[in-house]
Amino acid sequence: MPIAYLIFLTILTPALVGGLNLIFHKNANLRDGVTLLGALITFYFSVNIFLGFDGQATQYKLVTIMPGIDISFHIEPLGVIFSLLASSLWILTHIYAIGYMRGAKEKNHSRFFLFFSFSIASVMGISFSGNLFTLFLFYEPVSYTHLTLPTTPYV
């Protein structure tokens, strides 16, 4: 599979998993299982990007908003390592969060994991951002979702 597709799948998988959280909100085991599966799939895509990366920086332009402003993705060694780190940590933090949320009998699990998944999708986008505009598009959702995560049990 071309690396360009893997980049999009690495970003879209956590976002889709976040949406599935809302669909399966009544069944806790299914909801948590789908989210954990999404974390594993995201890590799988990140590993495939790492294995398919030949060491040469590559630029992929998704769309041109106006001349000089593009949504583009850039594959380079540091971004690939960052995506591997973030996706592997998502698996561990997800397992911890399930235990914590259930053990503390917190409410709003689906909402928490929705924002958590969107946050990871944004982090994956940041790791492959090709310019400042794309970085800005993915950084803003990270700031909003990270602001919401600590307050989720109270909302």
Set out the residue ranges of the language-model regions.
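Short conserved micro-motifs on helix faces and helix-strand junctions that flank
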Residues: 11, 73-74, 87, 128, ...
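Single conserved hydrophobic/aromatic residue that forms the stacking wall/gate
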Residues: 146-155
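Alpha-helical multi-pass transmembrane bundles of energy-transducing inner-membrane proteins
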Residues: 111-147
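Alpha-helical transmembrane segments and their immediate interhelical/interface regions
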Residues: 1-16, 133-144
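Anionic group-transfer/hydrolysis microenvironments
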Residues: 78, 142, 150
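Transmembrane helix-loop-helix hairpins at membrane boundaries of multipass inner-membrane proteins
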Residues: 1-6, 16, 20-114
